[in-house]
């Protein structure tokens, strides 16, 4: 699908996200069944999560604590009084034929989240605030496995696994403040950073721990009324969120340009075709016939409880980014990269605490170590090079004991085997040559051995300076102090 640029500039996209975050509690939201993802099908079930007659649910307090902590992290208003409701619908993976959720009195309302948008070319960071309508608690449904296809259409039969039934979820509903696929993907990533920093979820989209539904409409620029809203499901990565939105924006613009109707419907993103396809007519809240859950009492959060949970909050990603910029003098981009993962941020801070320069450590973590982790598909907690050893390596460069080139040469061995950089440098005899007399002697010998190059240099071919510097580096095995070598070569060649 292609759309002319002039048509794109006539319209703007109005986008909101509904994000479901699966919590990492040991037991389900209303019963004691395990939430283990890898268990065999239909083994983590009981009469409560299967909805047998006469059973009574009991709220897992950890779910409430997680909801309040995330509510505080998104700058929301925590309700002192809220309740659960029954959301009624029929589907094969919902054994009770209703889902316990929250409707008109959610646990959190009126929040916001600041996102950062990175220009890929300049690495410049701009910030935007996205409103959050509400956050509420609910139970997950089961899971259908379609044999012979990844969708119901085309499958020979379907199997149902109720292990996921009753697993606790937090649903976070944004305001329609997003305007592009990039903004939506970044918003979802910032939510994932929050839940990981809080330790309440692993935020793994591939395993369904974080699921995003997109609501999107198009309207002419300047128009206040919203267009017809379309929901998009089935996106299991941040890039899929961005691509699905970009496709849907083009599809809706093309429909408007051709005077074709846009229907209020739910559409699925198909990764294989890179398209959205119609799934069903979109339901409204009245279709679910919500009413208060009679088997659960209302929830009351006391001021004392709220203060207790506030004190348990860690330093959050946005706070850490601001501190890195102010305390360490890092760019907004480097601060963002370092704080994307809490373990990476902790590693970085430990290396700086060992006495190394904050900016130099940032360069090593975001470039060389990040490349090693990416190439070997490792988390930073899995490498044997301790942050203290990285700090020691950086300090060897700062003091002139070794050059940056030598540091890069020994880094692979340190990453594979660990140990002390100082001891490794001494063992290999790789200490940087910074002695003036020793370097002068080497340079004199090289100039004497290359009279033709010297004559050409003095005749105007000044780029031959690099030849002489290269010969010094070659003769010393890269151990010559680069700055001092350049200065001395300049002096000798001009003399």
Curated annotation (Swiss-Prot):
Q: A Pfam family this protein belongs to? A: GatB_Yqey
The protein's matches in Gene3D superfamilies, at most eight in alphabetical order, are given as: 1.10.10.410, GatB domain, N-terminal subdomain
Give TM regions.
none
Q: Which GO terms describe its biological process?
A: glutaminyl-tRNAGln biosynthesis via transamidation; translation
For this protein, the Enzyme Commission number is 6.3.5.-
Write down the superkingdom of origin: Bacteria
Which InterPro entries does this entry report, sorted A to Z?
Asn/Gln-tRNA_amidoTrfase_suB/E, Asn/Gln-tRNA_Trfase_suB/E_cat, Asn/Gln_amidotransferase, Asn/Gln_tRNA_amidoTrase-B-like, GatB, GatB_C_1, GatB_Yqey_C_2, Gln-tRNA_amidoTrfase_suB_CS
- Keyword annotations from UniProtKB, A to Z: ATP-binding, Ligase, Nucleotide-binding, Protein biosynthesis
The entry lists its GO molecular-function terms as:
asparaginyl-tRNA synthase (glutamine-hydrolyzing) activity; ATP binding; glutaminyl-tRNA synthase (glutamine-hydrolyzing) activity
The record's catalysed reaction(s) read: L-glutamyl-tRNA(Gln) + L-glutamine + ATP + H2O = L-glutaminyl-tRNA(Gln) + L-glutamate + ADP + phosphate + H(+); L-aspartyl-tRNA(Asn) + L-glutamine + ATP + H2O = L-asparaginyl-tRNA(Asn) + L-glutamate + ADP + phosphate + 2 H(+)
Protein role: Allows the formation of correctly charged Asn-tRNA(Asn) or Gln-tRNA(Gln) through the transamidation of misacylated Asp-tRNA(Asn) or Glu-tRNA(Gln) in organisms which lack either or both of asparaginyl-tRNA or glutaminyl-tRNA synthetases. The reaction takes place in the presence of glutamine and ATP through an activated phospho-Asp-tRNA(Asn) or phospho-Glu-tRNA(Gln).
Q: How does it assemble?
A: Heterotrimer of A, B and C subunits.
Matching entries from HAMAP family are given as: GatB (MF_00121)
Q: Which family does it belong to?
A: Belongs to the GatB/GatE family. GatB subfamily.
* Name recorded for this polypeptide: Aspartyl/glutamyl-tRNA(Asn/Gln) amidotransferase subunit B
Q: Species name for this entry? A: Rippkaea orientalis (strain PCC 8801 / RF-1) (Cyanothece sp. (strain PCC 8801))
């Amino acid at each position: 699908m292609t759309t002319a640029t002039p048509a794109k500039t006539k319209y703007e996209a109005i986008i909101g996200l509904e994000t479901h975050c699966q919590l990492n509690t040991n037991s389900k939201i209303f019963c004691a069944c395990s939430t283990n993802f890898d268990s065999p099908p239909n083994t983590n079930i009981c009469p409560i999560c299967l909805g047998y007659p006469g059973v009574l649910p009991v709220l897992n307090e950890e779910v409430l604590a997680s909801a309040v902590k995330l509510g505080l992290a998104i700058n929301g208003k925590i309700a002192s009084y809220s309740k659960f409701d029954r959301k009624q619908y029929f589907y094969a993976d919902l054994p009770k034929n209703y889902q316990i959720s929250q409707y008109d009195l959610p646990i959190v309302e009126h929040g916001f989240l600041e996102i950062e948008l990175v220009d890929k070319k300049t690495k410049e960071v701009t910030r935007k605030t996205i409103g959050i309508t509400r956050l509420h608690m609910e139970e997950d449904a089961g899971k259908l496995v379609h044999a012979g296809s990844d969708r119901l259409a085309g499958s020979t039969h379907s199997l149902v696994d109720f292990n996921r039934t009753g697993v606790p979820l937090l649903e976070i509903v944004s305001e329609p403040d997003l305007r592009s696929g990039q903004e939506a993907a970044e918003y979802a990533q910032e939510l994932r950073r929050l839940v990981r920093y809080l330790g309440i979820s692993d935020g793994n989209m591939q395993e369904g721990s974080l699921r995003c539904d997109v609501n999107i409409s198009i309207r002419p620029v300047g128009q206040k009324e919203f267009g017809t809203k379309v929901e998009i499901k089935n996106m299991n990565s941040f890039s899929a969120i961005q691509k699905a939105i970009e496709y849907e924006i083009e599809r809706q613009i093309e429909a408007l340009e051709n005077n074709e109707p846009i229907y209020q419907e739910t559409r699925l993103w198909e990764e294989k075709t890179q398209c959205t396809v119609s799934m069903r007519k979109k339901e409204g809240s009245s279709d679910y016939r919500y009413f208060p859950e009679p088997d659960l009492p209302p929830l009351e959060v006391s001021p004392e409880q709220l203060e207790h949970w506030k004190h348990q909050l860690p330093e959050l990603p946005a706070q850490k980014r601001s501190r890195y910029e102010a305390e360490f003098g890092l760019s907004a981009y480097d601060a963002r990269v370092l704080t994307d993962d809490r373990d990476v941020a902790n590693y970085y801070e430990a290396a700086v605490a060992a006495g190394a320069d904050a900016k130099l450590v940032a360069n090593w973590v975001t470039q060389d170590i990040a490349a090693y982790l990416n190439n070997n598909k490792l988390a930073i907690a899995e490498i044997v090079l301790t942050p203290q050893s990285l700090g020691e390596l950086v300090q060897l460069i700062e003091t002139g004991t070794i050059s940056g080139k030598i540091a890069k040469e020994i880094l692979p061995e340190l990453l594979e085997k660990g140990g002390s950089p100082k001891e490794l440098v001494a063992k290999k005899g790789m200490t940087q040559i910074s002695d003036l007399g020793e370097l002068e002697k080497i340079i004199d010998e090289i100039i004497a051995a290359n009279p033709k190059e010297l004559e050409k240099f003095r005749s105007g071919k000044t780029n031959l300076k690099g030849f002489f510097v290269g010969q010094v580096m070659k003769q010393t095995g890269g151990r010559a102090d680069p700055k001092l070598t350049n200065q001395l070569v300049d002096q000798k060649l001009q003399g």
